[in-house]
Amino acid sequence: MGQTLLILVDTHVVVWLAFDQKQMSKKARATIDEARNLGDGLAISDITILEVGTLASRGRIQLGISLESFLQEIEARFVVLPITGRACARAIGFPASYPKDPADRIIGATALVEGLSLITADREIRRSRLVPTIW
């Protein structure tokens, strides 16, 4: 059976999946479970790997395993979507009301370019209504 549901996951949700699922909404958890049950249903942007690595190297999160092992786990559990020129162009064109953080912009633009919904707790992203979100 082919992939029938693909959902883009924001960086903080990746961290919460690994360490603190109680932070996630019931709807987010249910959507993640559904996507996993239907095949390769969870995706991340390349930039999420950079963000997780940066958080770990700065001591903001404790991985409990080597960064390399954690990143291998991420790559095994998620479809990793590359940062494309189309996504960059889309991110640059976002209105000023969208979060300014370049990673947030790339993740949101990736969702739009790929036609995916984004699981995120980020209120600014959700309020923008620019990207289809699940929370």
Where are these regions (language model features)?
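Phosphate/NTP-binding elements of NTP-utilizing enzymes
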Residues: 52
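ABC-type ATPase nucleotide-binding domain
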Residues: 55
